Amino acid sequence: MSAPEGLGDAHGDADRGDLSGDLRSVLVTSVLNLEPLDEDLYRGRHYWVPTSQRLFGGQIMGQALVAAAKSVSEDVHVHSLHCYFVRAGDPKVPVLYHVERIRTGASFSVRAVKAVQHGKAIFICQASFQQMQPSPLQHQFSMPSVPPPEDLLDHEALIDQYLRDPNLHKKYRVGLNRVAAQEVPIEIKVVNPPTLTQLQALEPKQMFWVRARGYIGEGDIKMHCCVAAYISDYAFLGTALLPHQSKYKVNFMASLDHSMWFHAPFRADHWMLYECESPWAGGSRGLVHGRLWRRDGVLAVTCAQEGVIRLKPQVSESKL
């Protein structure tokens, strides 16, 4: 992929004003920032901790891709990333990232990254980088037709609207208060948010507009891909829960693997539509697929993830 300039996004940052003099996105300055220790060896800190009190998988993926990208030349860019989460991460301990240069070719280069804590691997991945190659072989699906982000409530306003509803189901109220207490470095606007007055089974599909908070800029396509890795894991596996939340509650849920394919240049600090669906769940696992669309209809990234999901029956309020 080439640098993400001239993307054909007529909206660009028009809805944000000129942010070039604003603080750089915290995703760049802190969350995905790595300390070099030796050749192909880096240390990551500054971890965002979700309510699970484990490391957020998107941050580990993003940092691993940052480390891998530092070992390739400027003219090659990631086109695929395949990851396994092998142990739960400890948010109190730095993560060491070791990059192995598997192959450096004329067109493609492959890097393996191992993330280590307490002397053991918690995460492994392989990333493949490609030099830009024009080709007549081109097609893509069509982007879903949805309202633009300017017409939708942001995540904070939507949660506030839900919480002000006196008919909101108790289960949702507890979960929304927990989410509202978190500070995340991304902005989200949900498309067609459901009503939450009662527990209900929903279709295993969701869509939301998403972008990094703050300014990243145009020039560094590698960093935009690393930020997309972070973004892609947010609320992704939860898509598989939507048909079952009326009868069950989560006992344990964690990502097992995650794959990404990068198709076209994009800016992660511009709005992108994240289209998520779960085609299958079973055997205490759920499978989710996702597509990140640019506003001009270009398919930028495709994602897939499988995770472990262990449920327990929902206790009805009449039995309490």
Swiss-Prot record:
Domain of life: Eukaryota
Biochemical pathway: Lipid metabolism; fatty acid metabolism
One Pfam family linked to the record: 4HBT_3C
GO cellular component: mitochondrion; peroxisomal matrix; peroxisome
Activity regulation summary: Inhibited by CoASH (IC(50)=10-15 uM). Also inhibited by cysteine-reactive agents.
GO molecular function, one term: medium-chain fatty acyl-CoA hydrolase activity
Residues at the catalytic site: D233 (charge relay system), S255 (charge relay system), Q305 (charge relay system)
Inducing stimuli: Induced in the liver, by peroxisome proliferator or fasting via the peroxisome proliferator-activated receptors (PPARs). Diurnal regulation of its expression.
InterPro entries: ACOT8-like_C, Acyl-CoA_hotdog, Acyl_CoA_thio, HotDog_dom_sf, TesB_ACOT8-like_N
Tissue: Ubiquitous.
UniProt-listed Enzyme Commission number(s): 3.1.2.1, 3.1.2.11, 3.1.2.2, 3.1.2.3
Motif Microbody targeting signal, chain ranges: 318-320
Gene3D superfamilies per the UniProt record, alphabetical: Acyl-CoA thioesterase, double hotdog domain
Swiss-Prot/TrEMBL keywords: Fatty acid metabolism, Hydrolase, Lipid metabolism, Peroxisome, Peroxisome biogenesis, Serine esterase
Positions in coiled-coil regions: none
Top-tier EC class: hydrolase
Intracellular or extracellular location(s): Peroxisome matrix
GO biological process, one term: alpha-linolenic acid metabolic process
Catalytic reactions on record: choloyl-CoA + H2O = cholate + CoA + H(+); chenodeoxycholoyl-CoA + H2O = chenodeoxycholate + CoA + H(+); acetyl-CoA + H2O = acetate + CoA + H(+); malonyl-CoA + H2O = malonate + CoA + H(+)
Presence of the UniProt keyword Signal in the record: no
Family designation: Belongs to the C/M/P thioester hydrolase family.
Other noteworthy facts: Constitutes about 1% of total peroxisomal protein.
Function: Catalyzes the hydrolysis of acyl-CoAs into free fatty acids and coenzyme A (CoASH), regulating their respective intracellular levels. Displays no strong substrate specificity with respect to the carboxylic acid moiety of Acyl-CoAs. Hydrolyzes medium length (C2 to C20) straight-chain, saturated and unsaturated acyl-CoAS but is inactive towards substrates with longer aliphatic chains. Moreover, it catalyzes the hydrolysis of CoA esters of bile acids, such as choloyl-CoA and chenodeoxycholoyl-CoA and competes with bile acid CoA:amino acid N-acyltransferase (BAAT).
Self-association and partners: homodimer.
Protein name as annotated: Acyl-coenzyme A thioesterase 8
Lineage per the UniProt record: Eukaryota, Metazoa, Chordata, Craniata, Vertebrata
Gene assigned in the entry: Acot8
